[in-house]
UniProtKB/Swiss-Prot annotation:
Reactions it catalyzes: deamido-NAD(+) + NH4(+) + ATP = AMP + diphosphate + NAD(+) + H(+)
Name of the molecule in the record: NH(3)-dependent NAD(+) synthetase
GO process annotations (BP): NAD biosynthetic process
HAMAP family in the cross-refs: NadE_ammonia_dep
Enzyme nomenclature, EC number: 6.3.1.5
Organism taxonomic ancestry: Bacteria, Bacillati, Bacillota, Bacilli, Bacillales
Gene designation per UniProt: nadE
Function: Catalyzes the ATP-dependent amidation of deamido-NAD to form NAD. Uses ammonia as a nitrogen source.
Binding annotation for deamido-NAD(+): 139, 172, 179, 259-260
Species whose genome carries this gene: Staphylococcus aureus (strain MRSA252)
């Protein structure tokens, strides 16, 4: 293992192996402990995309909220559907919601807000690329979730895990923004392992991962965008050997996207020693 890989493995907290029951208990305890420590929290808010990550986090949150209520703490889980117009994988969103069984479902179509933002910028002489518009979608989705959380005395739960964190494969202040990120410390295959243990429909964790943010490249697989497979990323995070080419791609993503893992730099935090 290279020196940088050792540093990254320590930072990303991924275990080489997990026990599903123990890991789920630990994740629920983290969520419950955070709520118990903040008496103002009356709701937890999460956008549900129909993908592996939000399905797993949604199920964990609902399980945690159920236990909190049994312990006398009044709390609600609000699952949010955030389509941009007509969502191509809407059926999978519904399957995820059936599996999660959230207390409440809110649907907000982000298309009018995103399109108006893009148009307003265009009128100001700022013409966004399709990729940049994709980031607008991600930020609008998170803005909606924070608006709901503010209105309902809640917090926003994130879906960031270590296989995304290492590569920076999320939008800064978009899907990378949240109050808590329960599944940080898991890689992609471990998320699949937990969903299988929880009895999720296979298609929800065996489907090809995609952010699906670009109009010109609908359903673009994450692995195509990253230039490396999740299998390689997961192996790297577990301290296993990968090819020199895979190592270079992963470490370049890690270095280039360091700013996404930090809050705004100050004169005391930049440059780093």
């Amino acid at each position: 293992m290279s020196k940088l890989q050792d540093v990254i493995v320590q930072e990303m907290k991924v275990k080489k192996r997990i026990d599903s029951a123990e890991e789920i208990a630990e994740l629920k305890q983290f969520i419950k402990s955070y709520v118990q420590s903040h008496s103002f929290i009356k709701s937890l808010v999460l956008g549900i995309s129909g993908g592996q990550d939000s399905t797993l986090v949604g199920k964990l949150v609902q399980m945690s909220v159920n236990e909190l209520r049994e312990e006398g703490i009044d709390c609600t889980f609000i699952a949010v559907k955030l389509p941009y117009g007509v969502q191509k994988d809407a059926d999978e969103v519904e399957q995820a919601l059936q599996f999660i069984e959230p207390d409440e479902i809110v649907t907000v179509n982000i298309k009018p807000a995103v399109d108006q933002s893009v148009q307003s910028l265009k009128e100001a002489g700022i013409v966004l690329t399709d990729f940049q518009k994709g980031n607008e979608k991600a930020r609008e989705r998170m803005k909606v979730q924070f608006s709901i959380a503010s209105n309902r005395q809640g917090i926003v739960v994130g879906t960031d895990h270590s296989a995304e964190n290492i590569t920076g494969f999320y939008t800064k202040y978009g899907d990378g923004a949240a109050d808590i990120a329960p599944i940080f410390g898991l890689n992609k295959r471990q998320g699949r392992q937990l969903l299988a243990y929880l009895g999720a429909p296979k298609q929800l964790y065996e489907k090809t991962p995609t952010a699906d943010l670009e109009d010109d490249k609908p359903q673009l697989p994450d692995e195509d965008a990253l230039g490396v497979t999740y299998e390689a990323i997961d192996n790297y995070l577990e301290g296993k050997p990968v090819t020199p080419e895979e190592q270079k791609v992963i470490e370049n993503h890690y270095i280039r996207n360091a700013h996404k893992r930090e809050l705004a730099y100050t004169r005391y935090t930049w440059p780093k020693s």
